[in-house]
């Protein structure tokens, strides 16, 4: 299990507000249960007090460049300045990065800069980030590009001690993942695939980052 950088734990009295930004997989497209990996991961960490609130914004086919352009406005619109000031709301941002950079031909250097811009901006806002990388495609050529992209994203996060989940590394060659994709007309996972992604996220330190589990 990877070591998750220490993130200040929220006060037991505060609510946890997750602001999640990403592409269509963040929204659980193709999931018959309409939960996606995020819904499953949060449900696993949600206690009886239901103190975790999720405010998600997903854009189909979003590249890192598009995310770098919109993240600030999206986060600011979902923040509670009063809650941040009085400590009643603990804000956290989840970034769900997709494969669009590979498909759009964006260079690795540019992809790195785009993610760095977002993470450095969140640091200035003093909001902890958790990054989930793009999963494999059923197309081997695309998956090869995603592996390189994910490695670049992981390096950016590592330099900033921000947790990163390498889903392409965890799911490439996984029989259940590949079977799930083979049934999809749009190269999206179904219930099984999203469950596998959620498992990787949970075992990538999601609960420790939230402060809801060790």
Predicted ranges, named:
Residues 2, 136-214:
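Catalytic His-Asp segment of secreted/periplasmic serine-dependent ester chemistry enzymes
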